[in-house]
């Protein structure tokens, strides 16, 4: 019963935020499928809660967001590897997100594949990357909700790609985003953004986020 109530709440939440013209039958159908197929088992996710809490506090990142991203990215499988060579719980690409985190830490090179199969290292780097996206790369975005959505999209598809869809000038891109209301930003992601998978990814993450 509790799950049904939560599921209903999430649907209403997404409809409210996105506007009835934005949340199509297909999107709602996808969310229902996520609910029906149980995106990931909380019994599996429970294995990582202690580590999630540790790095949530270290990087000041919402533990619900970390949990949701792990759930959507890997279903809590430490051995998950994508076609694009993303590795582990938070599906870190060593040559992109991994290297970016190393750069901000003043380190050379990138994490090894072996490192990224380690749950603690993987969640450390993944959560650090979320922090970098939110507090460094996207820091000029004023609305906290839009910043959350932009961070989630950037985690999966890159901040540079998102910002360049508004302008190749980062300052101008952020100014354009800051002129948008929440519904306008979500409508842009759903209907105009060139990365068509971004909306589906955002929907999945927010779905789990509100169930955790």
Curated annotation (Swiss-Prot):
CDD domains: LT_MltC_MltE. It catalyses: Exolytic cleavage of the (1->4)-beta-glycosidic linkage between N-acetylmuramic acid (MurNAc) and N-acetylglucosamine (GlcNAc) residues in peptidoglycan, from either the reducing or the non-reducing ends of the peptidoglycan chains, with concomitant formation of a 1,6-anhydrobond in the MurNAc residue. Its EC number is 4.2.2.n1. It comes from the Bacteria. GO terms for biological process: cell wall organization. InterPro entries: Lysozyme-like_dom_sf, Transglycosylase_SLT_dom_1. Transmembrane segments: none annotated. It is an enzyme of class 4 (lyase). One of its GO terms (molecular function) is lyase activity. Murein-degrading enzyme. May play a role in recycling of muropeptides during cell elongation and/or cell division. Belongs to the transglycosylase Slt family. This is Membrane-bound lytic murein transglycosylase E. It comes from Buchnera aphidicola subsp. Baizongia pistaciae (strain Bp).
